[in-house]
Amino acid sequence: VANAKSGHPGAPMGLAPLAHLLWSRVMTADPKDSRWINRDRFVLSNGHACTLLYIMLHLMGYKLSMDDLKAFRQLDSLTPGHPEANHTDGVEVTTGPLGQGFANAVGLAMAQANAAAAFNRDGFELFNNRTYVFLGDGCMQEGVASEAASMAGHLGLKNLIAFYDDNHITIDGDTNCAFTEDVGKRFESYNWNVLTVKNGDEDLSALWDAIVKAQQEKERPTLVCVQTTIGFGSLNQGKASVHGAPLKEDDIAQLKTKFGFNPEEKFVVPHDVRDAYKSYADRGAAKHAEWLKLFEEYGKKYSKEYEEINRRIAQKLPEGWEKALPTYCLLYT
């Protein structure tokens, strides 16, 4: 963000501990084949926080280099100011308009549940993936998020886990100026399982416990209200000023020192961190390989369903699709 002289550092800093936990311990994906159909999906509804997503994709080994990170917010780069699907490897949906990404996540979870219902068989759990989504106060204020949340609760999308970045700050300042509702109570009324983590900045154990409980939920989607500090570690942490403007040089220097980095170095990833994330990516690749073997065995027993899944993977229209199009009579000649 500082290098680009533009961007939003606050939310990425507040959500970094949760992001690390999700990618290192929770989500299953294969960066070498980012379109694997049974991968977990991640949606960043508060798309302005995309530096966090780009960093995680880079660490995991997606097609996003350090030079791409340096080109953040530059014309034609792979790291635009908001995530763009079919442009940046690993980005599931284009987000930016607040709340829209959350609705996209509900749609993804619906598709996952549909695939599981249509194709899973005894001994062949082909589709067991989940959708994870980050959203902030701005997303929570949008009608599109409310409508989608109501639908998700109605459908009982147990495979949907949302993390609400509850930092009480928007670009306008403290949320008390315009947004004082009890979000958790609202989601409970939508038939969501609602959990709270009081220290999302440092309490990884509480975050982990909440994720485990969310995964164990069998009837409802889950909202985890994660109380974070926007710009955690900055001299301006907790303030609206850290939401959408680069940190000053002295702030960046003290931040690096505080977290054990050389304040003189830029765009550096320690070797042990790279090794750790490679192991997380390798774990996902191994699960993908296991899935492919299961899928081949599935094909021997359920050939029709196997062919249908492959058609969908290839993104081909079903034979005779045009016959299902509606026809209209001419009212004039």
Whereabouts are the PLM-identified features?
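Glycine-rich ThDP/TPP pyrophosphate-binding loop and its adjacent helix/strand module
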Residues: 31, 87-88, 94-279
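Conserved small/polar residues in nucleotide/adenosyl-binding loops
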Residues: 332-333
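Polyanionic/metal-chelating signatures
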Residues: 18, 255, 280-284, 295, ...
